[in-house]
Swiss-Prot record:
Disulfide bonds join C2-C13. GO terms for molecular function: peptidase activator activity; toxin activity. GO terms for cellular component: extracellular region. Transmembrane segments: none annotated. Keywords: Blood coagulation cascade activating toxin, Calcium, Cell adhesion impairing toxin, Disulfide bond, Hemostasis impairing toxin, Prothrombin activator, Secreted, Toxin. Expressed by the venom gland. Residues 1-30 form the C-type lectin domain. This is Snaclec carinactivase-1 regulatory subunit 17 kDa chain. SUPFAM superfamilies: C-type lectin-like. The keyword Calcium applies. Used for quantification of normal prothrombin (CA-1 method). Belongs to the snaclec family. Calcium-dependent prothrombin activator. This protein may activate prothrombin via recognition by the regulatory subunit of the calcium ion bound conformation of its gamma-carboxyglutamic acid (GLA) domain, and the subsequent conversion of prothrombin to active thrombin is catalyzed by the catalytic subunit.
Length: 30
C-alpha cells in the first residue's frame, strides 16, 4: 500500500513530480 497521492508499480511506490527526471536521478533524489 502506498501513501495517498502515490502510485504503486511492481511493489514500489512512486510519485509523479512536476519536474521531469530520469529514473536513475529520481532514485537518487528519493
Amino acid at each position: 500500500d502506498c501513501l495517498p497521492g502515490w502510485s504503486s508499480h511492481e511493489g514500489h511506490c512512486y510519485k509523479v513530480f512536476n519536474q521531469e527526471m530520469y529514473w536513475a536521478d529520481a532514485e537518487k533524489f528519493c
